[in-house]
Regions:
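N-terminal Rossmann-like NAD(P)+-binding domain of SDR-like oxidoreductases, especially those catalyzing
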Residues: 1-161, 181, 213, 283, ...
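Amphipathic alpha-helical segments in well-structured domains
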Residues: 83, 174-175
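Short, conserved catalytic or interaction motifs in soluble domains
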Residues: 21, 164, 248
Length: 324
């Protein structure tokens, strides 16, 4: 989706992905485009590009619980080594850098909704901690490059994106519920389903990411003291260089999401209640005040409409066999 929108803007796009959790079918329609190139590559390795680079967007990482629990060490390596390599490329090219972070940096929050100023409630040694801490470290390194090297950096904290091109088996609640409903299988609800989530449709999320990416820098000229760059505005609360929440503040319970999916699919699937995973967050809702103030951005697509569009996609992707 992001590559599509960048190409529509007239950008040249070089996409690097090792496809550990990705699907090449999501970009197959772009492979013949004159301004698009794809290289299968692991960002944890040395990253070098011959041509000039205007922006480096670092989205590499397993991102669903199913994936980062299957690849815990690689998830940590991407957050550390991958972020370092991507930042190094941006610095070498004098490029703008954007880090895709996550609402998981807030852990199982004790504050709801979560503003960017909230430091989170994270268990660093839990199974989920590999993703939480990988992204927290990536944010710290990104801010260090901004403060020390003067790199123009951006950080977006993404809250639960969904929509077409999701993997049917990615383990996320929306795709899991939809596929189960289409197949007439029970919808597996963790716990009693009272835990809440806030889901943002992919088109809205991409619009927010691009608004952050193309927003002018508010950093004043650098003043160097010894080995440290000091910026008058570097730590201002509403600096574009500080993390920005992107998500839909429309908070729903998991049970309500199941109901919406059943209605959208016309399925009669029953609900099956299973134990909640360790450190599964009880609430999740973004405070998007900073995005509204700085970018004039807010999501437009409702959860119900987004789920209908996603059902249409997954119905085609999964295939007609054994579907209700």
């Amino acid at each position: 989706h992001l590559c599509d929108r960048l190409l529509e803007r007239g950008c040249e796009v070089l996409c690097l992905d090792n496809l550990l959790t990705g699907h090449e079918g999501n970009i197959v329609h772009l492979l013949g485009h004159p301004r698009f190139r794809f290289i299968r590559y692991d960002v944890c390795d040395y990253v070098y590009v011959d041509e000039p680079v205007d922006a480096v967007l670092h989205f590499a990482s397993p991102a669903s619980p199913k994936d980062y629990l299957e690849y815990p060490i690689h998830t940590l390596k991407v957050g550390a080594f991958g972020t370092h390599k991507a930042l190094g490329l941006a610095r070498a090219k004098g490029a703008r850098f954007l880090l895709a972070s996550t609402s998981e940096v807030y852990g199982d929050p004790l504050v709801n909704p979560q503003p960017e100023t909230y430091w989170g409630n994270v268990n660093p040694i839990s199974p989920r901690g590999v993703y939480d801490e990988a992204k927290r470290f990536a944010e710290a390194m990104t801010m260090a490059y901004h403060r020390y090297h003067g790199l123009d950096t951006r950080i977006v904290r993404i809250f639960n994106t969904f929509g077409p091109r999701m993997r049917p088996d990615d383990g996320r609640v929306v795709s899991t519920f939809i596929v189960q409903a289409l197949r007439g299988e029970p919808l597996t609800v963790h716990g009693d389903g009272s835990q809440t989530r806030s889901f943002c449709y992919v088109d809205d999320m991409v619009a927010g990411i691009l608004a952050v990416l193309f927003h002018p820098s508010d950093r004043p000229p650098a003043q160097r003291t010894d080995r440290t760059f000091l910026y008058v505005n570097a730590d201002a609360e509403d600096s574009i260089h500080h993390p920005i929440n992107l998500g839909n503040p429309d908070e729903r319970s998991v049970l309500e999401i199941a109901r919406i999916v059943l209605e959208a699919t016309g399925s009669k699937s029953p609900l099956q209640f299973v134990p909640r995973p360790v450190d599964d967050p009880g609430v999740r809702r973004p405070d998007i005040g900073r995005a509204r103030r700085l970018l004039g951005w807010a999501p437009r697509v409702s959860l119900e409409e987004g789920i209908r569009r996603t059902v249409d996609y997954l119905r085609r992707r999964v295939g007609a066999e054994a579907l209700v």
